């Protein structure tokens, strides 16, 4: 293989793997707001004490939660971190879980607030209009996802395989 071809392959791999390279430690950057891999990892661990989640799902929720929470606030059904902490305390008590509510991360509380808001949004009469507003706002987000997590398309972080990796038949 020629030296220039090898250099081109290495450069392509570096560019592909370097998504979020300007933000070291980032799982994603959303409209300039960095979501760190440590935030995703911690929220995943904390949420797995309640139910089963994976890092991609957690990252997806952290990307879209601000949009949902903002829309919920506009509808008068916004949820706060304090409400999420109270909800978590109730869940812990009902399920006899030993959680230190004072150390739960803001990311986990944001995801719980997001979930609470979504549940109330489902009860609204005009959910079609709301859904369209949410889709439009989410589509307008400038999202850069670390390739370790995949890519953000259609409001979900999904696994991707770089085109330079050949899949087995």
Positions of predicted regions on the chain:
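N-terminal targeting/tethering segments
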Residues: 21-110
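Short, low-structural-confidence N-terminal segments
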Residues: 1-53, 139-169
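Generic N-terminal initiation segments characterized by hydrophobic and/or small/turn-forming residues
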Residues: 8, 12-14, 59, 106-113, ...
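A C-terminal, polar beta->alpha supersecondary segment
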Residues: 25, 65, 69, 73-74, ...
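Residues at structural and domain junctions
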Residues: 6, 26, 58, 119-120
